[in-house]
């Protein structure tokens, strides 16, 4: 089964990071979420109750990203994946990618970040 729902390029301002400058100044974080979901029933019925409402998923991600500051992107991603997997039994797998586009690291790059994949058990 290859069906997915994705939320790409969500942007949130937060104060996450291991460096004190990140906690004081803050920065924009880009978040992508991909959910493995069987969409066949929703395709047949045209009813939102047969799928995962991506507006609700956005609000879940927003509450974590704009909430209490943490040190690691890995921790944020785990919280997002755990929240989605616990709230939506239709989701079989959650992939979360978080990017810092302008971290306080010298050099030239488009961004740094992490990506995790967690199965819904």
Curated annotation (Swiss-Prot):
One Gene Ontology cellular component term attached to this UniProt record is: cytoplasm
This protein's pathway = Cofactor biosynthesis; tetrahydrofolate biosynthesis; 2-amino-4-hydroxy-6-hydroxymethyl-7,8-dihydropteridine diphosphate from 7,8-dihydroneopterin triphosphate: step 3/4
- Name a Pfam family for this protein: FolB
GO biological process, any: folic acid biosynthetic process
Q: Where is the active site?
A: 100
Which InterPro entries does this entry report, sorted A to Z?
Answer: Dihydroneopterin_aldolase (IPR006156), FolB_dom (IPR006157), GTP-CH-I_C/QueF (IPR043133)
Is Cell membrane there in the keyword field? no
Cite the EC number.
4.1.2.25, 5.1.99.8
Specify the superkingdom: Bacteria
Q: What GO MF annotations does this protein's record show?
A: dihydroneopterin aldolase activity; isomerase activity
Q: Which residues bind substrate?
A: 22, 54, 73-74
Which UniProt key words apply to this protein? Folate biosynthesis, Isomerase, Lyase
Check the record and name the CDD domains matching this protein.
DHNA_DHNTPE
Which reaction does this chain catalyze? Answer: 7,8-dihydroneopterin = 6-hydroxymethyl-7,8-dihydropterin + glycolaldehyde; 7,8-dihydroneopterin = 7,8-dihydromonapterin
Disulfide bonds listed in the record = none
What the protein does comes down to: Catalyzes the conversion of 7,8-dihydroneopterin to 6-hydroxymethyl-7,8-dihydropterin. Can also catalyze the epimerization of carbon 2' of dihydroneopterin to dihydromonapterin.
What is known about its subunit structure?
A: Homooctamer. Four molecules assemble into a ring, and two rings come together to give a cylinder with a hole of at least 13 a diameter.
Family stated for the protein in its record: Belongs to the DHNA family.
This protein is called Dihydroneopterin aldolase
Q: Which organism is it from?
A: Staphylococcus aureus (strain Mu50 / ATCC 700699)
**Phylogenetic lineage:** Bacteria, Bacillati, Bacillota, Bacilli, Bacillales
């Amino acid at each position: 089964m290859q069906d997915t729902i994705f939320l790409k390029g969500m942007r949130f301002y937060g104060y996450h990071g291991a460096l004190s400058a990140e906690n004081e100044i803050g920065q924009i974080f880009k978040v992508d979420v991909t959910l493995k979901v069987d969409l066949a029933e929703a395709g047949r019925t045209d009813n939102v109750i047969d799928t995962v409402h991506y507006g609700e998923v956005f609000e879940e991600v927003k509450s974590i990203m704009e909430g209490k500051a943490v040190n690691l992107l890995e921790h944020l991603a785990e919280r997002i994946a755990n929240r989605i997997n616990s709230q939506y039994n239709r989701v079989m797998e959650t992939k979360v990618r978080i990017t810092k586009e302008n971290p306080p690291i010298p050099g030239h790059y488009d961004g740094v970040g992490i990506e995790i994949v967690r199965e819904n058990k």
